[in-house]
């Protein structure tokens, strides 16, 4: 095997151990898994030792894309800055009105005729993360003694936000069935609803499993939310990145049919679907006026005024393109008519807009094809080493249970894999809030992100499997912390 893995020297491990126990663990006395993992992966002394031992860093599960953004979006951003548009102004606390108008037009296409969004239903935020923290701050202010239920495993920031705002967060996870694995615990969520429940959080598509909620699932949750006056937060960050978009059901489509729009808030962002993570463009939207007005006040108090407003031209162009994709290219004239109130779209000719949609379509088809190939490649390489895997639904992430690691300390394996191969991994405890639940009975779970470099992604998975064999044969040659989470 090319660049065959070698177990580092005792001297190397001794130096790393000193840094780990005398510096990193002392600074992370609470031993929160994600903080500790990041402290190790980013420690300059450890990285220097790895470089000296010819160990190169690689990632297969970071959740950050290596793919480039659509060129049309980059051109729009550059053009707007050259024309001194948007960046010179302060905007309302909900964000630039042109951007919110464009978002309302786009999102309205999914609803029935009895209800529609207005620009006031939208708030631009600092990425989807900013939207999440504002919603939590709203709960803290208006419902401080209420409980939050969350689909688990899930994005770690929800736990961080709940801790920061001193809110009661209860994770809800189903039992794992190897023959029909699912991390979508709809019935379990409903069983755990009490009189103190105020917020239910679901991620659709799910992170990290990539599963998609069915129409039946969404109806169950929204009906009981309406009955008990509960707010449902649906994180749709990955909604555009599905392999079969015709089968994806939008939560507000269901809520509008159930007259439950007041019980729904949706969070979206441009980090994953547009490969624009560094721009921090996000937004939330809801027909719940108490929520949106509270978020506007929070934004005003933070004096953030959303940096996303600086990219209004990009947001407007994307809303137009996604609207055409949703309605089909044959209805582009209707969409152009609807968007005539949006300056960014109005100033473009019909032929420019048609060309933009065609160019984006080619870009997006290529992107999804790339993700699909990485998914198939990963499952093929893992082969029998993947004891449990999820169906191919969402294009960005999945998570697999790795065979033969049930009785291995998750943290120690992750740590030594990084120190030996340079491979950064995100594993089960990264997504489990009650981390004791990720015990030996559940096993070792590895998230895979398909948006990584093709060559490095393949090499990373191969090296992971090779390291597993070496580690299981020689456990005493590696660092042992015996930490559990």
Question: Residue spans of the language-model regions?
Answer:
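PLP-dependent enzyme catalytic core of the Aspartate aminotransferase-like
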Residues: 2-5, 97, 105, 109-117, ...
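Charged, glycine/proline-rich intrinsically disordered loops and linkers
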Residues: 5-37, 246, 319-366
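Helix C-cap/helix->beta junction micro-motif
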Residues: 165, 227-228, 421, 471
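N-terminal small-domain helix-loop-helix segment of the aminotransferase-like
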Residues: 29-127
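Conserved core of the PLP fold type I
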Residues: 86-224, 239-261, 265
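Conserved glycine-rich beta-strand-loop-beta hairpin in the small C-terminal domain of fold type I
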Residues: 59, 154, 310-314, 335-379, ...
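Active-site PLP attachment segment
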Residues: 254-294, 301, 307-318
């Amino acid at each position: 095997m090319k660049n065959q893995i070698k177990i580092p020297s005792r001297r190397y491990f001794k130096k790393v151990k000193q840094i780990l126990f005398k510096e990193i663990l002392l600074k992370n006395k609470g031993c929160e898994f994600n903080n500790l993992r990041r402290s190790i992966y980013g420690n300059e002394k450890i990285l220097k030792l790895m470089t000296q031992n010819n160990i190169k860093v690689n990632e297969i599960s970071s959740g950050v894309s290596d793919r480039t953004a659509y060129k049309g979006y980059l051109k729009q951003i550059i053009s707007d800055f050259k024309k001194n548009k948007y960046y010179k102004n302060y905007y309302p606390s909900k964000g630039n009105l042109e951007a919110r108008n464009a978002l309302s037009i786009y999102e309205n296409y999914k609803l029935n005729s009895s209800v529609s969004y207005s620009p006031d239903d939208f708030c631009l935020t600092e990425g989807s993360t900013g939207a999440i923290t504002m919603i939590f701050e709203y709960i803290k202010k208006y419902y401080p003694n209420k409980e939050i239920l969350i689909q688990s495993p899930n994005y770690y920031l929800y736990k961080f936000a709940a801790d920061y705002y001193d809110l009661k967060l209860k994770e809800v996870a189903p039992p794992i069935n190897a023959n029909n694995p699912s991390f979508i615990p709809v019935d379990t969520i409903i069983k755990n609803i009490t009189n103190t429940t105020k917020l239910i959080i679901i991620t659709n598509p799910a992170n990290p499993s990539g599963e998609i909620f069915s129409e039946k699932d969404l109806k169950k949750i929204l009906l009981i939310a309406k009955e008990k006056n509960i707010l449902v937060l649906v994180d749709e960050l990955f909604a555009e990145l599905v392999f079969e978009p015709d089968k994806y059901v939008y939560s507000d489509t269901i809520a509008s049919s159930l007259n439950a729009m007041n019980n729904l808030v949706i969070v979206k962002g441009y980090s994953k679907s547009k490969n624009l993570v560094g721009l921090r463009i996000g937004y939330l939207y809801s027909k719940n006026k108490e929520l949106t007005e509270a978020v506007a006040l929070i934004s005003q108090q933070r004096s953030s005024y959303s940096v996303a407003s600086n990219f209004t031209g990009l947001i407007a162009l994307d809303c137009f393109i996604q609207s055409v994709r949703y309605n089909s290219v044959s209805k582009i004239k209707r969409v152009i008519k609807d968007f005539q109130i949006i300056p960014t779209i109005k100033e473009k000719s019909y032929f420019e807009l048609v060309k933009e949609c065609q160019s984006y379509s080619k870009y997006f088809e290529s992107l999804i094809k790339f993700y699909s190939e990485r998914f198939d490649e990963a499952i093929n390489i893992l082969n029998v080493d993947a004891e449990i895997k999820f169906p191919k639904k969402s294009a960005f992430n999945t998570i697999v249970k790795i065979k033969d690691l049930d009785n291995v300390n998750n943290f120690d394996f992750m740590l030594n894999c990084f120190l030996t191969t340079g491979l950064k991994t995100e594993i089960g405890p990264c997504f489990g809030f009650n981390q004791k639940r990720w015990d030996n009975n559940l096993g070792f779970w590895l998230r895979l992100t398909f948006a990584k470099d093709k060559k490095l992604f393949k090499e990373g998975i191969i090296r992971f499997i090779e390291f597993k064999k070496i580690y299981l044969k020689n456990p005493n040659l590696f660092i042992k912390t015996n930490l559990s989470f």
